[in-house]
């Protein structure tokens, strides 16, 4: 599926950093003038990070490295979705707000109203959204229009019918009549919003989608539910699931669900 730029938001009393999301064709280039970090003195206290679950692993890695430089600084990480970041940053209960989507205009306005300046964006990494099925599922490829018809009751991509069974996607035998079990993120998630905008064309998710609090929960659900399908970052893949190759439309090239 399409790639998104994942951003970390760092908004404090002095420095404001906001999230951003954009389509990307490849990883961002490192600034050649960027100098190695130099440790300073007098850094201590507590740092709270509240925001995207998709960035939990990255935030943990950064926190561990930061603590090696500054053992007297304690970093607490809470990942419950990108939508939890702006309120926490505005309220001052968090100094870091990782987000996997762009800040909304209303969120920026609320921040500016309190602090007197707009948040600044720091782009940190690129993530790719993938569609996962159980490792035993033999599906070879899906189009974006089919994925929309599976997850959305609006079907704005224009597929010919609502898709509720695996047989409608071409599977035979024991799979043909089996209902498709749907797993996705909750509305606080930037991943939820990105999929809704780009895959569903801002249509509505089906009421049967089992909304999960985190990316790992989606993958775990698909792992234990043989007839399930779910969406998450490709980096969340485990041995229990398989990323489905995706094509933009029928007859187009199917692309593997990998970081490339």
Q: What name fits each language-model region?
A:
Residues 4-22:
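Gram-negative bacterial Sec-dependent N-terminal signal peptides
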Residues 23-260:
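Flexible loop/hinge segments at secondary-structure junctions
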